[in-house]
Amino acid sequence: MVPTDHPKRLLALVSFAGILALLSFALWPVFLISLGQEWGLSNTDIGTVSGAYFMGYLVATPILVGLTDRIDARLVFLGGCAFGGVGCLGFGILADGFWSASLTWALVGAGLAGTYMPGLQILNARLDDAARVRSVPWYTACFGIGTGASFGVMGTVLAFADWQVAAYLGAGGSVLAALLVLFQVRACPPAPVPASQKKRHPLDLRPAFRKPVALGYIFAYGTHTYELFAFRTWSFALLVFLAGRADGGFGIGAVTTIVSLITVTGMLASLLGARICLAYGRHRVIALIGATTALVSLLVAFSLTGPVWLVVLGLWVYNGFIMLDSGALTTGTVEAGDRHDRGALLAVHSMIGFGGGALGGPVVGYVLDQAGGADMIGAWFYALLAMGAGSAIVFSIQRHFWRRMA
């Protein structure tokens, strides 16, 4: 099959490769309860292992994403798949406690740094301006499909096999993603630097800090990602806790299905939010989404003592509101950049974004420990408030730009 240049087919192909590369994403969130007990970890330790994934992403991002301004992003994507595959194999073979799990899981996170934004750069380099603006929300929304599919696969493995099988499946996803991009995406050299501008070192990220509007989206993305990945890390454990409280209970299979559906349907919310931003103004819409999402987190926290079905529905709605501004924030950063420095902007976008993601899991784990543990309703109340703080900060940042540009 010949590599495609058609915008829609290219978007579908790169998005599917990204979904395959994300197959390992839910390995730790799904198995953290059983492995935490087996390895004698506290909730703070569990959250820190989760955060190691995003720290790996954070450390690798300036190198891997910054390189996409100098070399074909397709090559960076292949390198990211190699990191992810080796990390999954290392986790399956070597992980037996806090440090070994953290180090190997960080390598898997570094793999994501080489596939997520470089995948977007594959599209940016091959699409015209109009197609790029239309494609970014779809591509970023597919992150939700990938994570939802990962929860489905890893939850099924939890029911029928063990965590090592899950790790090997994650490695297989990275291999398939690499093969797809290698053989189905044509090579494309990076854009030449304009003669009026000095050639920039790939690790020189200063262009991002010269664009205040881009920084507004970037820092808002950091607090958004803090909340999103705190939710992703702990939602499976929260639903397992709720399952034990339900009349008659419900099993791991039901929890897996619920988390997968919650995650996948978040993609629709991301696309909807991007469309609303185009119609009513990006800063204003994101600010209002942030305020509403913080309020929803508070309402869900107060609903924890109510019927389990109501809490599950509330979590579903909460995830949807978290995702409403996800694609819009990334699109804002892309639009604020130029072709020759977009890699630098996306590198900073990813670093600050996933730096926030690295904090989400540990912060919520610490809150759970301090409030009595993950088997206490009161602890989950404060955990949800800690998550919702991210959207409150998004509101504050974007309100500033909304007012300034009014």
Annotate the PLM regions.
Residues 28-29, 214-259:
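Extracytoplasmic gate region of multi-pass secondary transporters
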Residues 59-95:
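Conserved MFS/SLC helix-loop-helix module at the cytosolic interface between two early adjacent transmembrane helices
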Residues 82-96, 292-305:
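C-terminal ends and interior cores of transmembrane alpha-helices
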Residues 104-142:
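Cytoplasmic helix-loop-helix junction between adjacent transmembrane helices
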Residues 139-185:
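Helix-loop-helix hairpin linking two adjacent transmembrane segments in secondary transporters
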Residues 179-184, 383-406:
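Multi-pass alpha-helical transporter architecture, strongest
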Residues 183-204:
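Flexible cytoplasmic inter-helical loops of multi-pass small-molecule transporters
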Residues 283-329:
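C-terminal transmembrane helical hairpin of 12-TM major facilitator-type secondary transporters
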